[in-house]
Swiss-Prot record:
It comes from Hydrogenovibrio crunogenus (strain DSM 25203 / XCL-2) (Thiomicrospira crunogena). Keywords: ATP-binding, Cell inner membrane, Cell membrane, Membrane, Nucleotide-binding, Phosphate transport, Translocase, Transport. The complex is composed of two ATP-binding proteins (PstB), two transmembrane proteins (PstC and PstA) and a solute-binding protein (PstS). Residues 26-267 form the ABC transporter domain. Its EC number is 7.3.2.1. It is a peripheral membrane protein. This is Phosphate import ATP-binding protein PstB. PANTHER family: ABC TRANSPORTER I FAMILY MEMBER 17, IRON EXPORT ATP-BINDING PROTEIN FETA-RELATED. Part of the ABC transporter complex PstSACB involved in phosphate import. Responsible for energy coupling to the transport system. It catalyses: phosphate(out) + ATP + H2O = ADP + 2 phosphate(in) + H(+). GO terms for biological process: phosphate ion transmembrane transport.
Length: 272
């Protein structure tokens, strides 16, 4: 990473913060995940701060996306997955037997690597989640669609074409639409799984600037293979390797003064 980019990244972060001084959104305690008999996550313990951006970095196969999918129980969809440990969202056990998983996924929204708009109008894409909740009042839907598209930085480009098929949008616009769809139901946490890896540099910049704004209203967890992106957009960064959480601290410290040699080796490009 160039010194100029690192300086820009540091300037954008909230100075003087530490994990201990932050309000906590999610607590992870002794978290283990298995695919059958193969253990993929090893004893993960961490606190994820509220209204901050936390990035997960590490080489392919390190477990960062697997961990991300634990936060809204997407791994439940894989038959051979089993988990151990505790995961709390604002004090509630996310894996309690009585937890309504559908309700949890409304509280913890997710945007995937490849834009996946529905083959519906832009308007219907954004209000899809509201309709699933039985909300059909046109005034409510109209207000929410405008709010979500503005929040996703897409309103000016889409306001005169809300009835057009969302598949006619560019890749970058489609990804911002997916973000609008995710925030329309006002989740507490937003998960982003490599949200710009399929986008061009201009669209990537738009998404990164959007992430910086969205943390005012949402707790954001982002998986990225791009260390420069992690440095630019996140307040905290977790480095993972082979299913282990190696180092987790504020982003400035991790990139400028890593405390673990394996972290230093990774961010300096010695492996990964």
């Amino acid at each position: 990473m160039s010194e100029q980019n690192m300086s820009i990244a540091i300037d954008r972060h909230h100075r003087g913060m530490t994990l201990d001084s932050e309000q906590t959104a999610i607590v992870v305690k002794n978290w283990n995940l298995y695919y059958g008999s193969k253990q993929a996550l090893h004893n993960i313990t961490m606190k994820l701060p509220q209204n901050r951006v936390t990035a997960f970095i590490g080489p392919s196969g390190c477990g960062k996306s697997t961990l991300l999918r634990c936060f809204n129980r997407m791994n439940d969809l894989i038959d051979i997955v089993s988990v151990e440990g505790e995961m709390l969202l604002h004090g509630e056990n996310m894996y309690a037997k009585e937890m309504d998983v559908a309700a949890l996924r409304r509280r913890v929204g997710m945007v995937f690597q490849k834009p996946n708009p529905f083959p519906k109008s832009i308007y219907e894409n954004v209000c899809y989640g509201l309709r699933l909740q039985g909300i059909n009042d046109k005034n409510v839907l109209d207000e929410t669609v405008e709010w979500a598209l503005k929040g996703a930085g897409l309103w000016e480009e889409a306001k005169d074409r809300l009835d057009e098929n969302a598949l006619g949008l560019s890749g970058g616009q489609q990804q911002r639409l997916c973000i609008a769809r995710a925030i329309a139901i006002k989740p507490e946490v937003l998960l982003l799984d490599e949200p710009t890896s399929a986008l061009d540099p201009i669209s990537t910049l738009a998404i990164e600037e959007l992430i910086f704004e969205l943390k005012k209203d949402f707790t954001i967890l982002i998986v990225t293979h791009n260390m420069q992106q992690a440095a630019r957009v996140s307040d905290y960064t977790a480095f993972m390797y082979m299913g282990d959480l190696i180092e987790y601290t504020d982003t400035d410290s991790l990139f400028t003064n890593p405390q673990v040699k394996r972290t230093e080796d990774y961010i300096s490009g010695r492996y990964g």
